[in-house]
């Protein structure tokens, strides 16, 4: 699996941990030559594509900084959604994969990052994520890719958290203050990359009273381990629906 912090669909730019675009990641997979590892895709693979979240987040930040217009931002995320669909069709499906699941993005405006934003900002952020998803769906129309709507999945848990074992779906589990202390002031945004739930000091970065199992969000946009398990459980059910794994597993 590939997971690179800050990655966008086709733009490789500074920021994040290893911000190589999804397009470059797939190209590398298709052309790599590593002893003991195959390159490319085949019918034995189950391929998950869950990316693009940083495109609407980037555009929202640019609009907030008056570095672009709202109309240009919407157009940019539409382009990114279309580019992701093209990537899936031309570089994954056309290269041998037959079981490909593509995730729609969850509504970023409902994440803790925008909890303090005004209604207009939240509405615009929601518009950006919806525009990306619409372009992605349109671009994949007629292809064999299966769609997993992560937005609907997370909306369900926000609507009734207790039924899924969560006690908090609004606040972050990681403490920005503790992480700042742990990193000597090098990380001040509470990024979950630097958040450790292991008990005891000095490296536990959880907020007082928080739980990595029962809080949905670790930081402003990333799920906790409990959030990831919840998503994985839902995806496992989808794989059964698709007929990709036995229904009795």
For the regions a protein language model found, what residue spans apply to each?
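Structural recognition of the beta-strand scaffold that forms the well-ordered cores
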Residues: 1-4, 45-51, 55-58, 93, ...
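Conserved SGNH/GDSL esterase-like catalytic core that processes O-acyl groups on lipids
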Residues: 1-82
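Stable alpha-helical elements in mature extracytoplasmic
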Residues: 22-25, 80-84, 88, 128, ...
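Extracellular/periplasmic catalytic domains that process cell-envelope and extracellular macromolecules
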Residues: 35-43, 47, 93-95, 142, ...
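A structural motif corresponding to the C-terminal end of an alpha-helix
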Residues: 40, 86-101, 131-148
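Structured, solvent-exposed acidic/aromatic patches
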Residues: 79, 90, 94, 101-117
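Mobile gating loops/cap/lid regions near enzyme active sites that modulate substrate access
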Residues: 112-126, 138-221
């Amino acid at each position: 699996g590939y997971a690179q912090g800050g990655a966008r669909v086709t733009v490789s730019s500074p920021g994040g941990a290893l911000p190589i675009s999804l397009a470059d990641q797939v190209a590398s997979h298709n052309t790599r030559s590593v002893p003991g590892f195959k390159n490319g895709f085949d019918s034995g693979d189950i391929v998950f594509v869950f990316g693009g979240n940083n495109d609407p987040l980037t555009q929202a930040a640019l609009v907030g900084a008056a570095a672009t217009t709202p109309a240009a931002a919407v157009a940019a995320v539409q382009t990114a959604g279309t580019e992701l669909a093209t990537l899936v069709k031309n570089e994954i499906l056309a290269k041998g994969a037959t079981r490909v699941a593509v995730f729609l993005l969850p509504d970023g405006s409902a994440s803790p990052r925008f909890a303090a934003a005004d209604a207009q900002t939240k509405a615009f952020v929601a518009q950006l994520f919806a525009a990306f998803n619409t372009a992605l769906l349109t671009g994949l129309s007629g292809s064999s890719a299966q769609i997993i709507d992560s937005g609907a999945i997370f909306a369900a848990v926000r609507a009734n958290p207790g039924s899924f074992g969560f006690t908090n779906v609004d606040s972050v589990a990681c403490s920005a203050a503790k992480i700042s202390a742990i990193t000597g002031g090098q990380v001040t945004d509470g990024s979950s990359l630097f958040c450790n739930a292991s008990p005891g000091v000095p490296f536990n970065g959880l907020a007082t009273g928080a739980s990595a199992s029962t809080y949905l969000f670790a930081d402003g946009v990333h799920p906790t381990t409990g959030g990831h398990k919840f998503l994985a459980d839902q995806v496992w059910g989808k794989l059964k629906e698709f007929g990709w794994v036995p229904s009795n597993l």
